[in-house]
């Protein structure tokens, strides 16, 4: 069932200073992988801080359908895994709802099993191209039956024995890299991924943590060679999932834009492949203090203290895109309140997200009085400090949670209110968003709930 069955519009209004302390729900990338690797490993995995959005729960259900036992006791998720190489053929198609990450990673995980696995998703996910993950799987011997353009619904028919491959990732995509590495788990010999541009590396770090024989070498040109030896043993682990930097972006930018704000955000994942937004905002003049940086489960974590700041426009280097691809919509909101021009380039990946995210952002900005130019792969925003004259529009979210949250943040600081046409799908990644923002003092109301 798609989220648009009964849309719930929401409106954000100019708010007084946002203040308080919050802990962001767990990182989505790490949450997906915790369920997957815990379900695959031998023995018991215990997870705290898991993001309980619909996307991640769908990944958990898929692992259950293939033999993993998953239960929740208090705040802890406990998984009894099947053991590497021992997943069972699911009886029914695996339904991933809106979750591109869950679907693509699971295709890699199960593709090399000698079994038949079918994948389905909601209307939005069924439009998204899966070829980038399916092509390397085909090289490994997997047969694919898919809807036109390598889209879902699709079925994978695994080979008797998969071939290990060396695969050069043609675009900066952590999902493609991860899918090939996961396919390598059940493949004899060494599977290699060659990655010219580094992307988020949670798969590598976590697989090593679960005991996989995985090595990473970076050559003199900065190209990463990631090798995994197949058919090894994975052992259950204890994981405390740090706060999601992509979700952190919304209260963080809101605190920068709403006058007089002072907000502390606890336990945020600071993995260097994910901090592009914080770096960019600091270049724009944002007052973001990084407190108590520490290591947790092999990942960098810190607390952030954010105070309202006067921002100035910057040119964002295109090579930073992989480390902040999900944050461009909310960066565009920050840029709308900055003095001068902000140029964001290298955004081709945004065209194939939950919506054509680049077009959706540009239309939303225009509807709310922002002077912006949309290019083939770029967005240029000319800001209005203080948000004078901004707002007053309704934004088409196209079932995209990040578009909805970004424009609700805009309405907190713009002169006139901003309305989004639907807010139900925010639950896919950040179910606590509305309550958490209200707790800081944000004026956001679902329409009809004034």
Curated annotation (Swiss-Prot):
Top-level taxon of the source organism: Bacteria
Gene3D superfamilies: Enolpyruvate transferase domain
Binding site for 3-phosphoshikimate: 28-29, 33, 173, 175, 326, 353
Entry annotation: catalytic residues: 326
Residue positions binding phosphoenolpyruvate: 28, 100, 128, 175, 357, 402
Pathway: Metabolic intermediate biosynthesis; chorismate biosynthesis; chorismate from D-erythrose 4-phosphate and phosphoenolpyruvate: step 6/7
Keyword Metal-binding: no
GO cellular component: cytoplasm
Location(s) in or outside the cell: Cytoplasm
Main subcellular localisation: cytoplasm
One Gene Ontology term from the biological process aspect of the record: chorismate biosynthetic process
Molecular function in Gene Ontology: 3-phosphoshikimate 1-carboxyvinyltransferase activity
Reaction(s) this enzyme catalyzes, per UniProt: 3-phosphoshikimate + phosphoenolpyruvate = 5-O-(1-carboxyvinyl)-3-phosphoshikimate + phosphate
Disulfide bonds: none
Enzyme Commission number(s) from the entry: 2.5.1.19
Keyword entries, A-Z: Amino-acid biosynthesis, Aromatic amino acid biosynthesis, Cytoplasm, Transferase
UniProt-listed InterPro entries: Enolpyruvate_Tfrase_dom, Enolpyruvate_Tfrase_sf, EPSP_synthase, EPSP_synthase_CS, RNA3'P_cycl/enolpyr_Trfase_a/b
The UniProt record lists the keyword Cell cycle: no
Function: Catalyzes the transfer of the enolpyruvyl moiety of phosphoenolpyruvate (PEP) to the 5-hydroxyl of shikimate-3-phosphate (S3P) to produce enolpyruvyl shikimate-3-phosphate and inorganic phosphate.
Listed NCBIfam families: aroA
Family the entry assigns: Belongs to the EPSP synthase family.
The protein's assembly and partners: Monomer.
Identification of the protein by name: 3-phosphoshikimate 1-carboxyvinyltransferase
Organism: Brucella suis (strain ATCC 23445 / NCTC 10510)
Gene name for this UniProt entry: aroA
């Amino acid at each position: 069932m798609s989220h648009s069955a009964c849309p719930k519009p929401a409106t954000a209004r100019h708010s007084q200073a946002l203040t308080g302390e919050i802990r962001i729900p767990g990182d989505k990338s790490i949450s997906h992988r915790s369920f997957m690797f815990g379900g695959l490993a031998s023995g018991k995995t215990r997870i705290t801080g898991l993001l309980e959005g619909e996307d991640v729960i769908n990944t958990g259900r898929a692992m259950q359908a293939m033999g993993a036992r998953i239960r929740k006791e208090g705040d802890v998720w406990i998984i009894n895994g099947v053991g590497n190489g021992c997943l069972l053929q699911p009886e029914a198609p695996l339904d991933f709802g809106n979750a591109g990450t869950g679907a693509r990673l699971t295709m890699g995980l199960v593709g090399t099993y000698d079994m038949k696995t079918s994948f389905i998703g909601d209307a939005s996910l069924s439009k998204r191209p899966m070829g980038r993950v399916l092509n390397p799987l085909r090289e490994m011997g997997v047969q694919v039956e898919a809807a036109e353009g390598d889209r879902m619904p699709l079925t994978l028919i695994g080979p008797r024995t998969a071939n290990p491959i060396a695969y050069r990732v043609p675009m900066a995509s952590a999902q493609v890299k991860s899918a090939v590495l996961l396919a390598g788990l059940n493949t004899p010999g060494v599977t290699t991924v060659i990655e010219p541009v580094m992307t988020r590396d949670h798969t590598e770090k976590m697989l090593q943590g679960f005991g996989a024989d995985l090595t990473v070498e970076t050559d003199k040109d900065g190209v990463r060679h990631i090798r995994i030896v197949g058919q090894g043993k994975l052992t259950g682990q204890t994981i405390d999932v740090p706060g999601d930097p992509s979700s952190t972006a919304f209260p963080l930018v809101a605190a920068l834009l709403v006058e007089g704000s002072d907000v502390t955000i606890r336990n945020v994942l600071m993995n260097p492949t994910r901090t592009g937004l914080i770096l960019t905002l600091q270049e724009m003049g944002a007052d973001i203090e990084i407190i108590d940086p520490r290591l947790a489960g092999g990942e960098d974590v810190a607390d952030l203290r954010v105070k309202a700041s006067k921002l100035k426009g910057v040119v964002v280097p295109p090579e930073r895109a992989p480390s902040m691809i999900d944050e461009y919509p909310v960066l565009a909101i920050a840029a709308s309140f900055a003095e001068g021009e902000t140029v964001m380039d290298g955004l081709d990946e945004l065209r194939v997200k939950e919506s054509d995210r680049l077009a959706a952002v540009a239309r939303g900005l225009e509807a709310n009085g922002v002077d912006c130019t949309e290019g083939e792969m770029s967005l240029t925003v000319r800001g209005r400090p203080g948000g004078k004259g901004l707002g007053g529009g309704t934004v088409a979210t196209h079932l995209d949670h990040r578009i909805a949250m970004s424009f609700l943040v805009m309405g907190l600081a713009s002169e006139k209110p901003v309305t989004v046409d639907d807010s139900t799908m925010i639950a896919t990644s950040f179910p606590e968003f509305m309550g958490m923002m209200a707790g800081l003092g944000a004026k956001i109301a679902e329409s009809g709930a004034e």
